[in-house]
Design a protein with these regions (language model features):
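Short glycine-rich phosphate-binding loop at a beta-alpha junction
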Residues: 97-103
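Long, low-complexity, Lys/Arg-enriched
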Residues: 1-97, 111-157
Length: 157
């Protein structure tokens, strides 16, 4: 059974990597990753994908397949919705599991990700809550566990 992770880009590598590391630490290690690329952030893509691949491999899985949805304009709302909807529905068709990460990205992109995750019934809709600002910009292993909370909004609703 495939496990899918759907997220968006950020110029802050930690904002994209830390939620995945927290999910892996909790036992959710994906086989495939979908990243929403935002115009102006393409220079960060190689760094982000490299870190995401490394995290998954370090948690005992093979290198994940990574698919990037590149936007020409960050207000392509239909394409943003499709970025989240397609892997969620595909996971349902193949009896896989899918997690939508709403942590990184612009606020409206996170709002779309949240709505799509709930509306299309993703197995998990994750947000990595960091309780202390002093740890912003720090990579997952450098943040004390008591400062982190991986919230699954599917358990909240």
């Amino acid at each position: 059974m495939d496990r899918t992770w759907v997220t968006s880009m950020s110029p802050n590598v930690e904002a994209v990597a830390n939620p995945l590391a927290a999910a892996c630490e909790s036992g959710y290690v994906p086989d495939e990753i979908y990243i929403l690329g935002n115009p102006g952030l393409s220079s960060y893509l190689d760094s982000v994908t490299s870190v995401l691949e490394r995290i998954v491999v370090e948690y005992g899985s093979k290198t994940p397949e990574i698919t990037v949805t590149n936007l020409d304009n960050e207000t392509e709302f239909g394409r943003i919705v499709e970025h989240y909807r397609t892997p969620v529905l595909s996971a349902h068709e193949t009896d896989g599991t899918v997690a939508v990460d709403v942590t990184p990205g612009r606020k409206f992109m996170s709002a779309i990700a949240f709505q799509a995750g709930i509306q299309y019934d993703a197995d998990h809709v994750f947000y990595l809550y960091l309780s202390e600002g002093q740890f912003y910009g720090r990579i997952f292993p450098d943040v004390p566990n008591q400062a982190l909370d991986l919230i699954d909004f599917q358990e909240v609703f």
